[in-house]
Amino acid sequence: SPGQRRLWFLHRAGSGSEYNMGSFLWLRGHVEPTLINQSLDVLRQRHAALRTTISVLDGTPVQRLRPFCATELAMVDIGALPREQRAQRALAVARSLRNQRFELEGGPLFRCQLIRLDSNEFLFAIVIHHILCDGWSMEILQRELLSLYSQFADGLPVNRLPAAVQFHDYVAM
């Protein structure tokens, strides 16, 4: 789309992290990292945008859909720090993830990290390049991720089929 072309140009002209969208979710209580990882894998399967990279063909950016590839959830444990330092350090780790430059051609343009403060407190960071997602879409992805996690935790069947409406369907409107 024209908007994505502008973001591609601006990404190349700047430091590269200005258009990273980050969302940080505090999780309290029992958290199963393996279920988060399974939920992320289903999101990547269902949403083509999360498997898309941007290549250059004859000087023009083009989207490339990559095949699904399972990945491991990145985890950081800061539980050894003094309790009063953990929340601030967790936010610093999440912001650092948000500020890392995405390589548009190599991808992926979507990354997550689970930061463990103690056995019942976590900060979950989701970062995606704005070329693939807007704020509204980020909220939808978060809701779907939480729903998938609940379904896995409750032993319910999970829909792994591609989402009926993809991000490019909205961009085309």
PLM regions: where:
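Acyl-group handoff/entry surfaces in thioester-processing enzymes
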Residues: 2-76, 81-173
